[in-house]
Amino acid sequence: MLSSVALRYLLVLSLAFLAVVTSSRTQSRFASYELMGTEGTECVTTKTISQICYQCATRHEDSFVQVYQECCKKEMGLREYCEEIYTELPIRSGLWQPNK
């Protein structure tokens, strides 16, 4: 059986993919992804996925807040995935922006 870290990693990647697919929709489509206030739900929001990816891709572990440390866990697979997407701090209140 997969460990909880592996399951969380897969969930974050799945939701990151969903964010990529739906990125062309209006910001109102992301209203349901607002932070819910608990670590578990923060890890799976579009808003925090962009922040997690930025932090992982740029290796700014020293500036992590606790939730990003928990979500990222210095996973090389997540870092490599994020490096392909993010090179600068996300804009639009943290919603993801792809590299061009």
UniProtKB/Swiss-Prot annotation:
Q: What range does the record give for the signal peptide?
A: 1-23
**Keyword Disulfide bond found:** yes
Q: Which residues cross the membrane?
A: none
Q: How is it modified after translation?
A: Three disulfide bonds are present.
For this UniProt record, give its keywords in alphabetical order, as a comma-separated list: Disulfide bond, Hormone, Signal
- Is this entry keyworded Signal? yes
Tissues/organs with expression: Expressed by the yellow cells, peptidergic (neuroendocrine) neurons of the central nervous system.
For this chain, one GO molecular function annotation is: hormone activity
The lineage's top-level taxon is: Eukaryota
Q: What does this protein do?
A: Stimulates integumental Na(+) uptake. Controls the activity of sodium pumps in the integument, pericardium, ureter and nephridial gland.
Protein name in the entry: Sodium-influx-stimulating peptide
